[in-house]
Amino acid sequence: MSHKTKSTTQERKAGKSSAPQRQVVSKSSLQKKVSKPTATAKLQKSKALHPRNAHNNGYDFAALVTAFPKLKAFVKPNPYGNLSIDFADPVAVKMLNAALLKFHYGVGHWDIPDGFLCPPIPGRADYIHHVADLLAVKKSSKKRIPKGPKVRVLDIGTGANVIYPLLGIQSYGWDFVGSDVDPLSIANAQQIFAGNSDIANKFSSRLQADSKHVFHGVIEANERFDLTLCNPPFHASLAEASEGTARKLKNLAANRAKSSQVMSPQVQPSGKVKPATDKNHGVLNFGGQKAELWCEGGELQFLRTMIEESHDFASQCLWFTTLVSKKENLNPAKALLAKIKAEEVKEIEMHQGNKITRVLAWTFLKPEQRELWVQYRDAQ
């Protein structure tokens, strides 16, 4: 996986801002004229996952089986004699995820209902590590990633798999709030944390009662988050989602047919659990519920809603972030961020096999306001 980061800073004219006690910034201090952005800064590309990603060396199946014996039945040599699983088998993929969570992150209980998304963990972990870098503060000559419960993160659309809270909690000790429009997803997320008593108090869930909103109805008055995360639904309809699944199945079949090109664990297609009643291997094998796969207007409309609503919570969140699957949606999203006067916008590009995923991050706080935020948080 390679990544590059683009950063745009928009400086506004100085003006008076009045913030109430115990508030780092006020909304009025965020609504000032924006000048032209500075030049784009690029980070050096890397062919690997994030340096802190536990999956940089692929999958150690022998160790995974030892940690999670249920995986053993699905592990077998591939055409080159290396241990692997059939990534077209949704049960095998789910067992692999459970093993990875147990071995690398100490998550003893993890399960999802049939038909819900089963996320590829290495890529999800990369998102967590990259957004952690946004929070890094310089201490002497080194940068420090803040850890522990003082850092609060909001996961929009946490899903039944609740993967981002699990990875963020076990990697950095952060506290999470997970929201979702699906009651079944919320119930399963709660069940997962109930089954992991050592971290059960680090996660709370909130049902989004209105699917037309993202932050409204979730973020409470005077509540503060250091980060928001989101993996938006990227299809505009069920038909479009089905077409996308069909393409994945076709590509997977083509790759399996090429015995001379065995994929490494890091570039395997993302396995997603199919419904248990589906006996036809040609039907949706990558799974996913409606809210996980599509929404009216697709990814772009979801991004627009998220960005517009983020302005209403400008002083309550340090960094807003989201994955962007479709490259063509980046420019419209950035244009909207410029329109609502985001102070700084970053684009982080991540590669996993042939798939390119981008993280879009933005903040309404000026650098000095961010410093005050950190001081206030760490003093609590």
UniProtKB/Swiss-Prot annotation:
InterPro entries linked to this entry: METTL16/RlmF, rRNA_lsu_MeTfrase_F, SAM-dependent_MTases_sf
SUPFAM superfamilies listed in its UniProt record: S-adenosyl-L-methionine-dependent methyltransferases
Database matches in CDD domains: AdoMet_MTases
GO molecular function: 23S rRNA (adenine(1618)-N(6))-methyltransferase activity
EC id: 2.1.1.181
KW Transferase (keyword) present: yes
Entries under Pfam families matching the protein: Methyltransf_10
Region (Disordered): 1-54, 260-279
Enzyme class, UniProt record, top EC level: transferase
PANTHER family in UniProt: RNA N6-ADENOSINE-METHYLTRANSFERASE METTL16, SAM-DEPENDENT METHYLTRANSFERASE
HAMAP family for the chain: 23SrRNA_methyltr_F
Function: Specifically methylates the adenine in position 1618 of 23S rRNA.
Name assigned to this protein: Ribosomal RNA large subunit methyltransferase F
Organism: Shewanella pealeana (strain ATCC 700345 / ANG-SQ1)
Name of the gene this protein is made from: rlmF
